[in-house]
Amino acid sequence: PGDSVETRINNALAQRTGAELYQEIVTTVPDGTAQTMIAARSNGNAYIKMDMGDAGSLVYILKDGQGYLVDDASKMAVRGEVPTVSTSEIVSADEGEAQEIPCTVTTVNVNGQDCEALSYTATDANGQTATVSYCLVGDDLKYVVTDAAEGRTIVEYRVTSTTVDQNLFNIPADYQILTQAEFEAAQANH
């Protein structure tokens, strides 16, 4: 009580950007398929692991300002340019956009739980509108829900730990580290 929903959401976002944390981000699309992304952050380093289904998993490590795309199957890491988006944007893709858009405080039922939420309407390039809701459970930003014509997409944030194993940010010693150009050349030879 006391703080508005908007203030509490902004506080939750600020905490997430600065904190050391290990979280699972689970995205459930309208057909019920769920995809899990692991995101960890500590000391300015970031680790992101995305489950790509049959293609295995994709790991991205940002360490000491250098980005690496790690492929466990081939034991290779491709050293790339660090994308211009900041780490916090990667981990919380659309979260900053709610600021300038008229928002409504609502209650959204997510997975059978009523959550206080801040909702706004977004229009995509094709003119389709969707309602995006930032949902709090207590003071924690737990879900970002998008309700669109094709159904509901739920992104759930599960912070599993506030301490991060620093080994996550290390590329295993037996992995080959290549530049993007070297990697492309190696692919061309196969």
Model regions and ranges:
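N-terminal leader/targeting segments and the immediate start of mature chains
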Residues: 1-45, 107, 167-190
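Short, solvent-exposed secondary-structure boundary motifs
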Residues: 25-33, 45-54, 89-99, 121-128
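Extended beta-strand-rich segments in extracellular/periplasmic secretory proteins, especially
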Residues: 90-147, 175-178, 182-183
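Short small/polar-residue motifs
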Residues: 7-8, 32-37, 55-57, 95-106, ...
